């Protein structure tokens, strides 16, 4: 085996939740480019189909879109069952679904809180649980990658209390699952992106004053590119190259959390 073979995903299968847009789509494309067959999921079947076709065209790997609601146990279980039926098994799980509510904490409604928590935390737990069970029962030494945020470590912007709470919990859940499932050869790690130009951050990027303020605090002096800046780290964490790396948080932020 050569060093490049360690990073190859040929013959592997992956499920990327939140894979039709932004960071999730970038990760899905990277996995496919490394040879994996991939299912991407989001709420919109149209978005899934469009992104899956683009990924297949650009990488030559199989990519299928399956719409799902990951905020419910039933929705996640159906998604996992359909993915297994489509790909045969799941070697790699990426949790990258995202949503947020931006408003002062005193104005938050219970529905606002639940809307974010159900996707950013509950959905991640349900997906890890369902896919983890599949990996254990099938004796698959799988790879789970959860997408957290730098906001779990530093609160980079105000008015996102539910988002920050969820992302912090995802980091600790990642460590807990890593400890619990290491005995099965399953690794669980988290990525913590900084400021990437995605639909979720569009409201910030389109405000010139905020955009300039953020760039002043990023040593790399640019925002992340979801199509390229997650490629290397996601392939590494999904491959045999990271089989002894688990329970870790990887900051992909252009140096933001260093200062």
Task: Annotate the PLM regions.
Residues 128, 166, 174:
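Active-site helix of classical SDR
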Residues 149:
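Residue(s) in the substrate-gating loop at a strand-loop-helix junction
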Residues 104-105, 109-117, 214:
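Substrate-binding pocket helix/loop in short-chain dehydrogenase/reductase
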Residues 20-22, 44:
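Conserved glycine-rich cofactor-binding loop
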Residues 2-5, 246-259:
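Short C-terminal tail/terminal secondary-structure segment
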Residues 94, 182-187, 245-247:
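Short, small/polar-rich loop/turn modules that mediate ligand/substrate recognition or access, typified
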Residues 133, 179-183, 243:
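Alpha-helical segment proximal to the catalytic Tyr-Lys
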């Amino acid at each position: 085996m050569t060093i490049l073979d360690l990073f190859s995903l040929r013959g592997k299968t992956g499920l990327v939740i939140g894979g039709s847009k932004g960071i999730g789509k970038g990760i899905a494309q990277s996995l496919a480019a490394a040879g994996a067959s991939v299912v991407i999921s989001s709420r919109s079947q149209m978005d899934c189909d469009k992104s899956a076709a683009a990924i297949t065209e650009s990488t030559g790997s199989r990519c299928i879109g399956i719409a799902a609601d990951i905020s419910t146990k039933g929705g996640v279980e159906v998604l996992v069952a359909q993915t297994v039926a489509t790909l045969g098994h799941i070697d790699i799980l990426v949790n990258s679904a995202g949503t947020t509510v931006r408003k002062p904490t005193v104005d938050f409604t219970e529905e606002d809180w639940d809307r974010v928590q159900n996707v950013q935390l509950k959905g991640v737990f349900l997906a890890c649980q369902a896919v983890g069970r599949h990996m254990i029962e099938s004796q698959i030494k799988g790879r789970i990658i959860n997408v957290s945020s730098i906001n779990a470590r530093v609160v980079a912007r105000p008015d996102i209390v539910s988002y920050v709470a969820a992302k912090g919990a995802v980091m600790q859940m990642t460590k807990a699952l890593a400890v619990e499932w290491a005995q099965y050869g399953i690794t669980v790690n988290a990525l913590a992106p900084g400021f990437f130009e995605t639909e979720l951050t569009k409201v910030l990027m389109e405000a010139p004053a905020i955009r300039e303020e953020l760039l002043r605090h990023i040593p790399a002096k640019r925002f992340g590119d979801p199509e390229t800046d997650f490629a290397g780290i996601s392939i590494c964490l999904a491959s045999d190259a990271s089989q002894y790396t688990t329970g870790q948080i990887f900051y992909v932020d252009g140096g933001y959390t260093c200062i």
